[in-house]
């Protein structure tokens, strides 16, 4: 069975909705506010010396940077798959997931990251940008793949709560997809070696280790992006007669779903080199646009030089 490490407020709240029996779920946070209603306290790890991070990555890093081994000694990683679930924009979850990712790499355990993005403030966008760069840094330093499934809570609606719910549901769907892939009672022609090679495609292709994006999509031809390359593809289908559509990847594995309640499945997960870089460029552009507008709107300040030494004006 796979593990889910729910990191930070968003990760914890999404993980509470995971169906019983799909995964071993562990909760890691810097605050008790989201952990109070978890009945099994043996599955909870609270970072000492903190009461939330206030969207400050550095605070979480300083308090947790040496705790990855401790957490994974208490919550033993799965040999099948480990999911790190968090937002990308808060001060706790993203940094917790990055530090745990580093330890999972050290222990040679398979993992993917599921991250929920947010665009509700420039601080959140900057946090996400820094986290994506961190994933690239971790990959480069450890010469290992860091595969990230990003769920985007931005659309044209004005209801921010609705958008967040959609992104949370999409992240939950991602968890369910990987739970299916690790459930041998509902699948055939797919094993741990296939999943490992999909994640660590550098072992079976001529590609170098990289920080990549995972894209869950219907099995259909997708527009080509000159900045990205599909290094590995995982075809999930209920029919042995279906082939992949579009350009072939460097590595392909297929999972046949035998669950009778899933009798018309035909989709895939693309493991995309260059996807993280594309997303980094996107955030850099958005932040630059925000700062440009902010600077344009900044007006000349009001003179209060007549205030007394305590700042009061009479």
Description of each model-found segment:
Residues 1-314:
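Tubulin/FtsZ superfamily GTPase core signature
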């Amino acid at each position: 069975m796979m593990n889910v490490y729910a990191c930070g407020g968003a990760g914890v709240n999404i993980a509470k909705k995971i169906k019983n029996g799909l995964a071993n779920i562990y909760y890691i946070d810097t605050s008790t506010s989201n952990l109070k209603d978890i009945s099994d306290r043996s599955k909870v790890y609270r970072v000492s010396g903190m009461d939330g991070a206030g969207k400050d990555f550095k605070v979480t890093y300083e308090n947790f940077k040496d705790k990855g081994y401790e957490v994974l000694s208490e919550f033993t990683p799965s040999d099948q798959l480990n999911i790190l679930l968090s937002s990308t924009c808060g001060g706790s979850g993203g940094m917790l997931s990055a530090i745990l990712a580093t330890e999972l790499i050290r222990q040679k355990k398979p993992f993917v990251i599921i991250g929920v993005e947010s665009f509700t403030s420039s601080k959140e966008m900057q946090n996400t940008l820094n986290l994506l760069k961190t994933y690239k840094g971790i990959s480069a330093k450890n010469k290992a793949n860091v595969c990230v499934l990003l769920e985007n809570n931005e659309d044209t609606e004005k209801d921010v709560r609705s958008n967040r719910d959609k992104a949370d549901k999409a992240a939950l769907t991602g968890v369910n997809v990987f739970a299916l892939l690790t459930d041998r009672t509902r699948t055939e022609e797919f094993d741990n070696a296939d999943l490992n090679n999909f994640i660590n495609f550098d072992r079976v292709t001529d590609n170098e280790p990289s920080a990549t994006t995972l894209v869950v999509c219907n099995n259909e031809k997708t527009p080509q992006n000159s900045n990205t390359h599909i290094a590995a593809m995982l075809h999930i289908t209920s029919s042995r007669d279906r082939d992949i559509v579009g350009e072939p990847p460097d590595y392909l594995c297929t999972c046949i779903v035998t669950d009778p309640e899933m009798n018309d499945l035909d989709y895939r997960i693309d493991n995309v080199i260059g996807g993280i870089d594309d997303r980094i460029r996107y955030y850099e552009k958005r932040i630059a646009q925000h700062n440009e507008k902010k600077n344009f709107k900044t007006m000349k300040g009001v003179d209060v030089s007549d205030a007394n030494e305590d700042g009061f004006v009479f």
